[in-house]
Design a protein with these regions (language model features):
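Two-component/phosphorelay signaling modules centered on CheY-like receiver
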Residues: 5-23
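Active-site beta3 strand of CheY-like receiver
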Residues: 38-44
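Receiver (REC) domain active-site loop signature in two-component systems and cognate sites
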Residues: 49
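C-terminal output helix
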Residues: 80, 98-107
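Short, conserved "switch-loop" micro-motifs in signal-transduction and mechanochemical regulators
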Residues: 76-77, 88
């Protein structure tokens, strides 16, 4: 999972770690390093981060491995941003704050493809 807010990483990690092995990054550069090194099965990616734009990170991730499903997340509820994330290769788009049960459902759906 990639998010610049440690609180979000902590919430997701605590919730998802019972089912999945979870690795996190707080910025796009580190996330790309982890994708290169570990080839994760699924990525939760904050689209609105400082530094490298989340959409640019998504595009770079898809160049590294187009088969890895990416679920785009952000505080901004914006249909244009959601559409752009999907256009760039995101499996789905999910606004913060999270409904953790639905997030689990999205993860399972993405991994079953």
């Amino acid at each position: 999972m990639v998010d610049d807010e440690q609180e979000i990483i902590d919430i997701l990690q605590e919730h998802l770690a019972t089912t999945y092995d979870v690795t996190s990054a707080r910025d796009g550069r580190r996330a790309l390093e982890l994708v290169r090194a570990t080839r994760p099965d699924l990525i939760f990616l904050d689209i609105a981060m400082p530094g490298i734009n989340g959409l640019d990170v998504l595009k770079a991730m898809k160049q590294l491995d187009p088969a890895i499903p990416v679920i785009a997340i952000t505080k901004k509820v914006n249909t244009a941003l959601a559409a752009e994330a999907i256009k760039c290769g995101a499996f789905s788009y999910f606004p913060k704050p999270f409904d953790l049960r639905y997030l689990e459902h999205l993860a399972a759906s993405a991994l079953s493809r």
